[in-house]
């Protein structure tokens, strides 16, 4: 069975590596200490602190394994995948004009693993991301949003 390939920007790849290291430190540090302290309390069968710490340990360990799998199967997309700024693609910064809101917005198209609206990173699998892929500067597009409404946007810049 072929492994799934995860396309990531360099920044997204490095961010996952940092998250993995932080989780490992937490797992080896505070969570391990909480488990040790809970064990010292005696009977583990009715020890809620022990159960909570073990559950947290399991969740952290699962996330570390998930990150390892993604990193092991990652394909790094450098500089938006190509140097051609005439077409919207993964990793590109896109400035659009939203005619409904009458304002310009700027964001980067990223993989679902990297999407973060607070950092203006939009997934290529989101309605707006899918609608923009392969489009060119100056194109005007009507997009169906996740809520089912429609919005008209124009691509102002691609970088």
Swiss-Prot record:
Which keywords are on file for this protein? Coiled coil, DNA-binding, Transcription, Transcription regulation
Q: Which Pfam families match?
A: GreA_GreB, GreA_GreB_N
Q: Coiled-coil regions in this chain? A: 2-41
MF-aspect GO terms: DNA binding; RNA polymerase binding
Q: Which GO terms describe its biological process?
A: DNA-templated transcription elongation; regulation of DNA-templated transcription elongation
NCBIfam families per the UniProt record, alphabetical: greA, PRK00226.1-4
**What role does this protein play?**
Necessary for efficient RNA polymerase transcription elongation past template-encoded arresting sites. The arresting sites in DNA have the property of trapping a certain fraction of elongating RNA polymerases that pass through, resulting in locked ternary complexes. Cleavage of the nascent transcript by cleavage factors such as GreA or GreB allows the resumption of elongation from the new 3'terminus. GreA releases sequences of 2 to 3 nucleotides.
Q: State the family named in the UniProt similarity comment for this chain.
A: Belongs to the GreA/GreB family.
The UniProt entry, under HAMAP family, shows: GreA_GreB
The protein, known as: Transcription elongation factor GreA
In its UniProt entry, the species of origin is given as Petrotoga mobilis (strain DSM 10674 / SJ95)
**Name of encoding gene:** greA
